[in-house]
Amino acid sequence: MAEPQPYEKLMSMADLLTPAAIRATATLCLADHIKAGATTSEALAERAGTQPDVTDSLLRHLADIGILTADDEGRHYSLTPIGEPLLSDHPFSLRQVLRNDSMIGRGTQSLLRLDHTVRTGEPTHGGGYWESVNNDPAYAEEWGEQARAFDAVADQPLSWGAQYIVTEYDWSRARSVVDVGGHLGAILLALLRHHPHLRGTLVDLKNVAEQAGARFARSEVADRAEAVVGSFFDPLPKGADVYLLSAILADWRDDDAVRILGRCRDAAGPEGRILLADVAMPTNGPATELQFRSMMPAPSRSAEELEALCTEAGLKVTWRGRTGLRTLLELAPR
């Protein structure tokens, strides 16, 4: 076989069909349907609500690339080991990551406009991305699925160094904490479980706050946890001892980060404290650098850069904890 010409290699490298086919399969839940017995294009189309002829083309392409295998007649399909992580119940399931309609999947689509990020330094999705994800009812079901999946695993470990928030900060001085932008409440739940004297309030936008509240209600700390709908660009609940900002600022430009810190400063007052626990996303070369920058403005701020933002927001550092993957800084109004 002749060696491919350079232009052929380039077109192969730039091809979007196979990534799109895999993500369509994840979005349409086709792997789950195949496992449940819908193994022909007709049966899959009926189960998934898709067009039989296009579904057949998709299945044949998935077989060509090794995601599926077909029987001798080319009618019945089954998953290969490569395709099995597309199952929702696979131990290493990638379906949520690869779905076009998931938060992660939608964020990944920003790579299609990488030229915008290279030209401007800004992510393709700005604050409007988060507003859409957190307010669009279509995402409420996703948040609910994630919350129930987390609850189904006993002793769900915290990731990205978040465990140091629970174990390295001196929580004995606090009685109340507000988790600002606390997502589904994993960190707040861990805090309340490890420090039974604490009471916690989670603040986030509508979809995620409602799911976090339902998750708290199902937990053993229901009497000490609440979730309220709100934005960290608006006034926050006042009077708590500690305001936690975990993995928030990387998603925002410097001026927005200063605004967020300022809202925490105003709510904390002269006696309160802010615990900044920002993540510096690890990069393994230019590929991950480009991926992170296409989705967030500042994925890897150093501790010094974070401290400069805090100073601009009228805050001083009163304690320095771990740095690296997770930078921990306790802050107080200047």
Predicted feature locations:
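Alpha-helical subdomain
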Residues: 1-64, 69, 82, 171, ...
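Conserved Class I S-adenosyl-L-methionine-dependent methyltransferase catalytic core
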Residues: 10-25, 32-33, 47, 53-175
